[in-house]
Amino acid sequence: NYSIHIYMAFASIMKIFLPKDRVFYGLFEEVSSNLAQMSDIFTKAIAEKDSTARHNLLKSLEEWEHKNDEVTHKIFIELGRNFITPFDREDIHYLATSLDDIADYLWGASKRVMNYGIDDIDDVTQDFANIISKSIKALNKAIYGLRDMKDIRSLTEACVLINSYENEGDDTLDKGMMHL
């Protein structure tokens, strides 16, 4: 009987030290999926010709941004709760913060389009929206690839693709600046 209590105590202690990697991966995947939804809505809004419909689409991103804030908060809570993590604690914190920044930037861009009453959406802005969407789809692939680190090739390809979209975005920014 005494050995059962020792075993149960040991099992309880071990739960504290065992990694909760499924928790972190699931939360990162949730944030990434939310970002994909946000980029789809943003791209659709930028392509929308009707200003009222565009405004409604852009306004809907606020709710998505708040959802991402909640999930990011859960990641930070889990980070504080778990002694062992699937990868470096600082990397988890940095990734969570960076993903949250993307949601913040999408919502910020949406607010500026609404607040400044931008109705004439040019080709450069539409190109940017498409680049953002492609980048987030590649990011989504990379985030889902974290769970299975055995497929490093696919993860690396997604990261290279994200970098190429960043370069495409830089070129599009230069193009937009020339039109000012």
Identify what each model region corresponds to.
Residues 8-180:
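Cytosolic, long alpha-helical scaffolding segments
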Residues 1-7:
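Short, Lys/Arg-enriched N-terminal segments with co-localized hydrophobic residues
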